[in-house]
Curated annotation (Swiss-Prot):
Motif ('HIGH' region): 21-31
SUPFAM superfamilies: An anticodon-binding domain of class I aminoacyl-tRNA synthetases, Nucleotidylyl transferase
Protein name (record): Glutamate--tRNA ligase
Organism: Histophilus somni (strain 2336) (Haemophilus somnus)
EC number: 6.1.1.17
Family annotation (PROSITE patterns): AA_TRNA_LIGASE_I (PS00178)
Catalytic reactions on record: tRNA(Glu) + L-glutamate + ATP = L-glutamyl-tRNA(Glu) + AMP + diphosphate
GO molecular function, one term: zinc ion binding
Essential cofactor(s): Zn(2+)
Binding positions for ATP per the UniProt entry: 251
Pfam families named among the record's database cross-references: Anticodon_2, tRNA-synt_1c
């Protein structure tokens, strides 16, 4: 059959991979890892990456799911050279190939009713036979062409299908185990397994990276490709991702959607780094830049074993990237979280200033955004436990002394603020804790925060002094 590419295929491209999600839900972490492996293998081999949306399930596919998949891919920065292509826009092409297959005797119309097929299955089960179509319609000519029918692929009945899976090694399946697959439904729509074959053929896909749940589809697809005279791609079926309890990853293990991880405050660099390690590695190395992944990744090195998703490990990686990426890059992502939590970050220090200060305690950008409120918003409430411990009447004197000395500062620096705290403790003959803890609670409303000299510097002089005075007034009201 004549190859009809969708785009000008570069004959020098030795590797062309694809990611082909179905838009029936969000982009989950398993799909994201498959996309990543496929993308990395293409980049490692100076190849091309194709994005295809397999939306033949008209009842379950939604525009919202398509948008979510595209958003997830863009957030992960997995750019594609070709696409996105939609199967629903290619029905004419699929049916053209099916009609040619019928003409060439590679496929045939099947007019069997549901009742006949159910009776056939029941009879085969009673006789301990594997349920399969008996080719009753293969040589039938009594039905009019326009009578309701499906189209079946005429699968070979002898021999075996053998392929060398890049992850799992040699896989061999007898053709006697395979049925005559329906490739076009009664309503005229082509079926998933057939669309995939034509797409991979038309798009010049050389390597198919996908989940192990597709292994059973592979021999059927290979037989169709052979019938069409099309090249057979290399297949790589990666294992599932389990939760840390060994069960298949699901919502009960926490977030499973890529964009949920964005919402929870994870950086795309952290999630990408974590996903690549779920089944692949390079020695004991844990941290990989994108450039290192591209240079080192090999699909043949991916493990056959299922991987366990460990949220604590992801959090560790995320904190690493928050602290090690250029602060301006992290700030760009943090802006989204600040807006989501209603924090006007234009009214205070630059985000690039607070990130190094808060990242020692925060593992996610969500935590960082929430922890930053006191830099931008007035303190309206105090932590109750901290109040009981640090806002006793004797805290008034060090707070008042602090306010007096801080007001006199002409140069609002970390060093000068620290010196004021030390002088206050010395003059009142008290420990630094008796100064620092009430000071912290007054300025942040919290019992814990970064060092108070740095915190006060970022909060600003006027706000700091105002909050100290508010705290003194609060202590008076509590002890009337």
């Amino acid at each position: 059959m004549k190859l009809e590419p969708l785009f000008n295929l570069d004959p020098n491209t030795k590797v062309r991979t694809r990611f082909a999600p179905s838009p029936t839900g969000y982009l989950h972490v398993g799909g994201a890892r498959t996309a990543l492996y496929s993308w990395l293998y293409a980049k490692h081999n100076q190849g091309e990456f194709v994005l295809r949306i397999e939306d033949t399930d008209l009842e379950r596919s939604t525009p919202e799911a398509t948008a979510a998949i595209l958003e997830g891919m863009e957030w992960l920065n997995l750019a594609w050279e070709h696409g996105p292509y939609f199967q629903t826009k290619r029905f004419e092409r699929y049916n053209q190939v099916i009609d040619q297959m019928i003409e060439q005797g590679l496929a045939y119309r099947c007019y069997c009713t549901k009742e006949r097929l159910e009776d056939l299955r029941h009879s085969q089960e009673q006789n301990k036979q594997k349920p399969r179509y008996d080719r009753y319609c293969l040589h039938q000519s009594e039905y009019p062409v326009d009578a309701p029918h499906v189209v079946r692929f005429k699968n070979p009945t002898e021999g075996t299908v053998v392929f060398d899976d890049a992850v799992r090694g040699r896989i061999e399946i007898s053709n006697r185990e395979l049925d005559d697959l329906i490739i076009r439904r009664t309503d005229g729509s082509p079926t998933y397994n057939f669309c995939v074959v034509v797409d991979d053929w038309d798009m010049g896909i050389t390597h198919v990276v996908r989940g192990e749940d597709h292994i059973n589809n592979t021999p059927r697809q290979i037989n169709i490709l052979k019938a069409l005279g099309a090249p057979i791609p290399t297949y790589a079926h990666v294992s599932m991702i389990n939760g840390d309890d060994g069960q298949k990853l699901s919502k009960r293990h926490g977030a499973v959607s890529v964009m949920q991880y964005r919402d929870e405050g994870y950086l795309p660099e952290a999630l990408i780094n974590y996903l690549v390690r779920l089944g692949w590695g390079h020695g004991d190395q844990e941290i990989f830049s994108r450039e290192e992944m591209i240079a080192l990744f090999d699909i043949h090195s991916v493990s056959k074993s299922a991987s366990a998703f460990n949220t604590e490990k992801l959090q560790w990686l995320n904190q690493h990237y928050i602290r090690s990426l250029p602060v301006e890059q992290v700030a760009t992502h943090l802006e989204w979280h600040m807006k989501k939590h209603g924090i006007d970050y234009s009214n205070g220090p630059n985000l690039a200033e607070i990130i190094p200060v808060l990242s020692e305690r925060c593992k996610t950008l969500k935590e960082l955004a929430i922890s930053s409120r006191y830099f931008y918003q007035d303190v309206e409430n105090y932590d109750e436990k901290a109040v009981a411990k640090n806002f006793k009447p004797e805290a008034i004197k060090p707070l008042a002394k602090l306010a007096e000395k801080l007001t006199a500062l002409s140069d609002w620096t970390v060093e000068n603020i620290h010196e004021v705290m030390s002088q206050t403790a010395q003059e009142l003959d008290i420990g630094m804790g008796k100064v620092g803890m009430p000071f912290r609670l007054a300025v942040t409303g919290l019992g814990q925060s970064p060092s108070m000299d740095i915190t006060a510097k970022l909060v600003g002089k006027d706000r700091t002094i105002s909050r100290i005075n508010n705290a003194i007034a609060f202590i008076h009201t509590q002890n009337v």
